[in-house]
From Swiss-Prot:
Coiled coil: none annotated. Residues 1-114 are annotated as: Disordered. The lineage of its organism: Eukaryota, Metazoa, Ecdysozoa, Nematoda, Chromadorea. PANTHER family: TYROSINE-PROTEIN PHOSPHATASE C15H7.3-RELATED (PTHR23219), TYROSINE-PROTEIN PHOSPHATASE DOMAIN-CONTAINING PROTEIN-RELATED (PTHR23219:SF18). Residues 1-15, 41-50 have a biased composition (Basic residues). Residues 55-73 have a biased composition (Polar residues). It comes from Caenorhabditis elegans. Keywords: Hydrolase, Protein phosphatase. It is an enzyme of class 3 (hydrolase). GO terms for molecular function: protein tyrosine phosphatase activity. This is Putative tyrosine-protein phosphatase C15H7.3. Belongs to the protein-tyrosine phosphatase family. Non-receptor class subfamily. Residues 18-40, 74-114 have a biased composition (Basic and acidic residues). Its EC number is 3.1.3.48.
Amino acid sequence: MERSQKSARKKKKTSKSGNDRSIRSERKSKQKKPAGEKSQKSRRTRKSRGPKGNGFTSRETIQPSSSGQSEGTTRMDDQKDEKKDDKKEEKKEERKEEKKEEVKEPWSEEEPAKRMVANGFFTTTNVGGTFKQTDNFKTPMDSCPSFKNNMHKIRAPDCPIPEEKLVKLTNGPESFICAAKITVPDFNRTMILTQVPDLSSAPDIADFWRMIHQESIASVVIAVMPLEVTLQQILPLLSGTYSTYGKMFVNNKKVESAVGMTEYCLEIFPDGCSNSLLTTVYHLHNWRQKRGLEVVTDLVATMEKVMKVNDNTVLMSMNGTGRAGTMLTLFTAMLQVQKGKEVNAKETLASLRAERCGIVDNIDQFGTVHRSMACWFKNNSTNEEVQRKVVEFAPSIQ
């Protein structure tokens, strides 16, 4: 009995220990995972820990950051390449512009310029001989009654203006002004030569502006030295200022200055009239009376501007004959070339003097016309022979 109980207890213990072993083995088997699962779990664990895990960084955590760096570097490289390409394009455009500047465009006046050079327009003997051979026709005083009756208003009494050539003022107490209308070939606008008004007479200054407004003058070119005339007595010199001359209101809207010329943009209208006129006044201030002009660059540039405007024009000097007449002769010659015609200096001067006696005082002023034409040709012509001839005629032309 006792033996059977002991054997039963042994069997029970044995089964219990077996059960314990099986339980333990199951637990161990549960803890043990396939190698693949273990490595994936470890990688996930390492990845989740990242840089916080005792300074350890797995291969997977490095890859995203290195990829971001490579993308950023690629973008920077692309931007640098784009900048380089932009700079290359800018340099190409600059080279194109430089080439355009180097290669002059064909000048439309090239053919008449070549003919004038070939026919000896730019020779010293031609200038002197032509001037001496040109008559200075003077109109008889008896055929100039208005001129004769207003001698107190005239600076050059030896150069009478025919009645039909005088500018007649309207809407004022006086109708006379010492100004002549000139017919210029191929110029279908009004061209007037006039003297500087008497600065001691306020009515004379007012009459000048009355004429400008009445004749709708777009361009006024004044050739006087500062010592000859205080220009401020004739017009407001500062931008934004204005002056009144009798019933004429003159407003200075803009001023531009060059070396030998100052340009004024003026608004002109009679008192009580809203019909204003915009006029540009060009003042050439380095040209002495009875002399030629030494530096002709600004004179040529001014005549080019007047031709471009192609509107009613006034040319003014102290007496309205010498320097004003020289400017008129130059303007006429340039206009003829622009129309494709060859200039005959003798015929041009003679026809203008028939309009207004006293035009061009002397050979120096006539030489100014030729040197100005040489400067104009030099600045525009691409023909080698034209360039050579004008430089020979006026080596230091400027």
